[in-house]
Amino acid sequence: VVFNTPGANANGVKELVLAGMLLASRDIVGGIEWVAKEKDQEDIDKLAEKQKKQFAGCEIMGKKLGIIGLGAIGAMVANAASALGMEVYGYDPYISIDAAWNLSRTIKHIKSLDEIYSQCDYITIHVPLLDSTKEMINKEALDKMKDGVVLLNFARDLLVDEDALIEALDSGKVKKYVTDFANHTVAGHKGILVTPHLGASTKESEDNCAVMAVKEIRDFLENGNIRNSVNFPNCSMGVCTGAGRVTICHKNIPGMLGAFTTVMGNAGVNISDMTNKGKGDYAYTMMDLESEATEEIVKALEAVDGVLKVRIIK
């Protein structure tokens, strides 16, 4: 069983997205570079007053932000941007109940990407890289966006067709592109702000990931529960209060539960509670028993065709 720690770095990424919007709205980087270049000028204070207008920009308050994907990160960005006075539009046809509950009531849930493209001044992407999302931001999508849009991508680099993006930047269709993924296409372009994959590079994110990983592994070892596995489904029966508990990793094929209950029946063991979850080719079964599990039961379960691993938890 392989675990991951989704959402542990969500706040770190959220803060970087907000910083990206601010940097794209006002030429803060250009201003800092100008001061560094002119640092030896005796009248730098007076020069600064004369030159500051070239670094002027706009405020994000009152602007429209479109968020594609309202998972852990997208939802946090939505709430924070709304608190900063932005008009936030969210698109996510697969939004979870937990994510929906965490969203501010001020967030407008949009049912079409075209609405995001046509209405929003800023668009940020927070979706996984799938066959269906690869290069979802292509020439067709870019053509539908408002002139002067700011596009942010802190999810996956391949979500954006970068050749089409460069054309849109050069034509002025896109004002700025902010991304966390450096490559030869985007690095050095005057309209692109690139960070070196800093999304989760905070002490807090690293600590959160470590704590979450320890909790997941401990719960699996002590109780047999699975949370946030890459290759197996989420499956939990809490803390075992019965006489025994057995967990079984097996192939996701018909007839497995019948075979397991037959083994228990032949051993004269009553099952007080049971759950089974499947994910792709694999499944996971947990059984609480009214008597302790024995090595004979384990051997009988392991002999069932399709069983990968049997563990006695208690």
Segments the model singles out, each with a brief description of its role:
Residues V1-A8, A155, H197-G199:
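Short beta->alpha connector loops at strand-helix junctions that form conserved
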Residues T5-K64, N225-N228:
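Phosphate-binding beta-alpha-beta segment of Rossmann-like dinucleotide-binding domains, i.e.
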Residues K14-E33, N79-M86, M212-N225, T261-G265, ...:
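Oxidoreductase and adenylate-handling cofactor-binding alpha/beta cores
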Residues M61-K64, K139, G148, A243:
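Phosphate-coordination loops involved in phosphoryl transfer and adenosine-cofactor binding
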Residues K63, L70-G71:
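Glycine-rich Rossmann-fold phosphate-binding loop(s) that bind the pyrophosphate
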Residues G74-A75:
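N-terminal Rossmann-fold NAD(P) dinucleotide-binding loop
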Residues P93-T185, S201:
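Rossmann-like adenosine-cofactor binding region
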Residues Y177, A187-K190, L198-K314:
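NAD(P)-dependent dehydrogenase/reductase Rossmann-like domain
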